[in-house]
């Protein structure tokens, strides 16, 4: 979330019209300070911190602290996240992002009190996430992304708990939590956490295996790989006396990572068949009637995609011109026209088409395709040649030239 002048004004509006507005002098001072903060979230946080220090009993204290914490998260200001994040959580624990950031910062220091606080926040973080499990959106693309991020977040919450209980001397519980985290979302963090506590408990080979998992994890930062490699070798040598066979351990970890990735992708594609697809002509899109069209089935044909929406005025102007071009190629079996609707609310589409007497036969929903093709404005018309490459892209249109231009582009693509 970006903090800018408009956001500052929203905060000021809250202060002005809230149930407990601050005194005029306080509000004037805050208004002036926020105006000077400009577009910088760092300055925004500094202003709010100074204001709260001067006015610790401000009627809008909770709202100001919440805004301060969000701005601090934006710029990764650990001091302010910790100092004000715990104050914010004391008023409202239902803040997953704040719970995670505060717990993570607390665990940067191996201290009993900090670990106990971090454990409390990490457990609440997990609880908040699991409460959200049933709120996945209906849209397949959004649902797949939600499930992926939800699993990743739950895994993070368990890794944080593992670190906290480990710091508190509960090694076996830490190992169990780290293993559970890795099962939910295999990645470098839970693998490294499990390896650390396994090594501490004297289970060198198991530790080496998890260090290998961290080493080969696709999401592992480059700067951590060398450390994982060293720890893996150290744990292995303690058990085996040398590094002979260590390469096999790494290969096994690689094969596990590949297998895990394949299974996860298959699971997500049950929800959204386009998960992980990077070639637009390999996409599967939904028809207005609920059917599915695999664009790969159109291989060898020229594909014309018209991206539009019910709320788009220029799209209505372009539509009869687009239909005129379609008629020119009505007898061309190697040209396919697809209307790609981009409305967020798909229930608006059919009534719109019926009331405007537009055809429904070749209308499909974008299902994430517009994002892949970076369609940022509509109408946009994209022509793919018979090899599946983008041959022409028309962002917007010039009414008096559109028919001739699109006709020429399609004819040229047919001849390729």
Model-based region annotation:
Residues 307-324:
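Conserved redox-active cysteine motifs that mediate thiol-disulfide chemistry
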């Amino acid at each position: 979330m970006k903090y800018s002048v408009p956001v500052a004004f929203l905060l000021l509006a809250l202060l002005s019209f809230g149930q407990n507005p601050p005194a005029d002098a306080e509000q004037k001072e805050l208004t002036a300070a926020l105006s000077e903060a400009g577009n910088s979230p760092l300055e925004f946080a500094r202003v709010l911190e100074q204001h709260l220090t001067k006015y610790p009993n401000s009627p809008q204290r909770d709202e100001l602290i919440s805004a301060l914490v969000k701005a601090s998260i934006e710029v990764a200001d650990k001091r302010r996240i910790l100092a004000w994040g715990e104050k914010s959580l004391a008023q409202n624990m239902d803040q997953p992002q704040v719970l995670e950031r505060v717990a993570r910062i607390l665990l940067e220091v191996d201290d009993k009190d900090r670990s106990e606080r971090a454990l409390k926040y990490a457990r609440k973080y997990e609880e908040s996430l699991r409460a959200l499990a049933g709120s996945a959106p209906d849209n397949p693309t959004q649902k797949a992304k939600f499930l992926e991020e939800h699993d990743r977040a739950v895994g993070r919450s368990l890794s944080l708990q593992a670190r906290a209980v480990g710091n508190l001397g509960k090694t076996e519980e830490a190992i169990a939590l780290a293993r559970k985290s890795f099962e939910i979302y295999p990645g470098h963090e839970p693998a490294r956490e499990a390896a650390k506590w396994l090594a501490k408990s004297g289970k060198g080979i198991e530790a080496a295996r998890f260090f290998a998992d961290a080493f080969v994890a696709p999401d592992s930062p480059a700067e951590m790989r060398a450390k994982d490699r060293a720890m893996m070798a150290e744990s292995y040598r303690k058990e085996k006396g040398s590094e002979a066979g260590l390469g096999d351990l790494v290969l096994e970890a690689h094969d596990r990572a590949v297998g895990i990735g394949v299974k996860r992708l298959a699971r997500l594609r049950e929800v959204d068949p386009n998960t992980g697809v990077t070639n637009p002509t390999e996409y599967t899109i939904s028809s207005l009637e609920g059917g599915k069209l695999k664009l790969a089935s159109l291989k060898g044909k020229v594909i014309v995609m018209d991206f539009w929406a019910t709320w788009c005025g220029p799209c209505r102007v372009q539509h009869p011109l687009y239909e005129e071009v379609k008629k020119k190629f009505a007898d061309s079996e190697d040209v396919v026209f697809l209307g790609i609707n981009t409305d967020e609310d798909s229930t608006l589409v059919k009534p719109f088409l019926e009331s405007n007497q537009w055809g429904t036969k070749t209308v499909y929903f974008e299902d994430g395709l517009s994002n892949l093709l970076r369609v940022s404005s509509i109408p946009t018309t994209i022509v793919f040649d018979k090899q599946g490459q983008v041959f022409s892209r028309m962002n917007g249109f010039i009414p008096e030239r559109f028919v001739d231009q699109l006709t020429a582009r399609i004819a040229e693509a047919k001849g390729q």
